[in-house]
């Protein structure tokens, strides 16, 4: 009986894998829940079908709970988006997904990875700094703010080679 309760309340481990067109609706829904302007299913599908785009997902109990997506160009990649469902944040899932994704990008020949992040998104900035990203530029007034004052985008870079 104790084994039953242990299994029932145990924290499930996420399953990390490449994302594909089958994940379009779930990625679009998670993106919409995570960002002020979410991607439509058509936008997500277009990205997932693009041969220069790499995407990974995290499934928790069979449900998509996080994703990361990048576009490759020559020997560089740009992380287009990272999202983790609110209920799954704070447990290291984004770190695991980011590390897997960076290894795969390196395996595909990317020597440097770039991304943009809202200057007020401290959790994401902390994640990226811990993963070895460093600020290389700042775009003032880039992100619209609900309070009327736009936020800067920090441009971060990490060398893979």
Model-derived features: where do they sit?
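Conserved catalytic-core motifs of GNAT/GCN5-like acyltransferases
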Residues: 2-3, 114-116, 129, 134-151, ...
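Conserved SAM-binding loop
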Residues: 16, 117
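Flexible coil/turn residues that form the inter-helical turn or adjacent wing/linker of helix-turn-helix
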Residues: 37, 111, 149
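Short amphipathic helical patch at the helix-1/turn junction of helix-turn-helix
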Residues: 84, 118-119
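Short glycine/proline-centered loop/turn elements that form peptide/ligand docking sites
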Residues: 98, 121-124, 141-147
């Amino acid at each position: 009986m104790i084994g039953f309760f242990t299994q029932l309340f145990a924290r499930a481990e996420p399953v990390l894998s490449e994302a594909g067109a089958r994940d379009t609706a779930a990625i679009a829904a998670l993106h919409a829940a995570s960002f002020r302007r979410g991607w439509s299913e058509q936008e997500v599908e277009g990205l997932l079908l693009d041969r220069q785009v790499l995407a990974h997902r995290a499934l928790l109990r069979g449900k998509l709970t996080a994703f990361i997506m990048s576009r490759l160009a020559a020997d560089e990649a740009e992380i287009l988006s990272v999202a983790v469902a609110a209920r799954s944040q704070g447990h290291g899932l984004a770190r695991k997904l980011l590390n897997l994704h960076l290894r795969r990008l390196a395996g595909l020949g990317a020597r440097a990875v770039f991304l943009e992040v809202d200057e007020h998104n401290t959790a994401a900035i902390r994640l990226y700094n811990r993963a070895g990203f460093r600020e290389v530029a700042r775009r003032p007034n880039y992100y619209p703010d609900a309070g009327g004052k736009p936020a800067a985008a920090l441009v971060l870079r990490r060398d893979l080679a």
